[in-house]
Amino acid sequence: MPEPAKSAPAPKKGSKKAVTKAQKKDGRKRKRSRKESYSVYVYKVLKQVHPDTGISSKAMGIMNSFVNDIFERIAGEASRLPHYNKRSTITSREIQTAVRLLLPGELAKHAVSEGTKAVTKYTSAK
């Protein structure tokens, strides 16, 4: 006599497991929204500086937050500078001035030299 087919046990009420596949009513998977971050670039720089060192996801989140913060500060300052001089264009000069105003001493000098190097590399590649 064949045994009745065993079905999977029903999940307990208040179970901690969540449904992993998000599906619409018609059965298709819902497309996940992409979250932009600088994690790929932070990781590349880390490997250039310390090839044998890793980074935790929490530390990567902090680095991503830091890069976003600095970007917003530089962009904000650079957008105010042309207004003072009655101009309507943000150039590399405004970015450079914003960096000089925001970053202290030696850090500003290094940032400006690295930025100049990056702009030169970009223009020569065109």
Swiss-Prot record:
The modification PolyADP-ribosyl glutamic acid is found at E36. The modification N6-butyryllysine is found at K6, K21. The modification N6-(beta-hydroxybutyryl)lysine is found at K6, K12, K17, K21, K35, K86, K117, K121. It holds the Pfam family Histone. GO terms for biological process: antibacterial humoral response; antimicrobial humoral immune response mediated by antimicrobial peptide; defense response to Gram-positive bacterium; innate immune response in mucosa; substantia nigra development. Residues 1-36 are annotated as: Disordered. Glycans are attached at S113. The modification N6-crotonyllysine is found at K6, K12, K13, K16, K17, K21, K24, K35. The modification ADP-ribosylserine is found at S7. Transmembrane segments: none annotated. The modification Phosphothreonine is found at T116. Coiled coil: none annotated. One of its GO terms (cellular component) is extracellular space. The modification N6-lactoyllysine is found at K6, K12, K16, K17, K21, K24, K44, K86, K109, K117, K121. There is a cross-link at K6, K21 (Glycyl lysine isopeptide (Lys-Gly) (interchain with G-Cter in SUMO2)). The keyword Zinc does not apply. There is a cross-link at K35, K121 (Glycyl lysine isopeptide (Lys-Gly) (interchain with G-Cter in ubiquitin)). The modification Dimethylated arginine is found at R80. The nucleosome is a histone octamer containing two molecules each of H2A, H2B, H3 and H4 assembled in one H3-H4 heterotetramer and two H2A-H2B heterodimers. The octamer wraps approximately 147 bp of DNA. This is Histone H2B type F-S. It comes from Homo sapiens (Human).
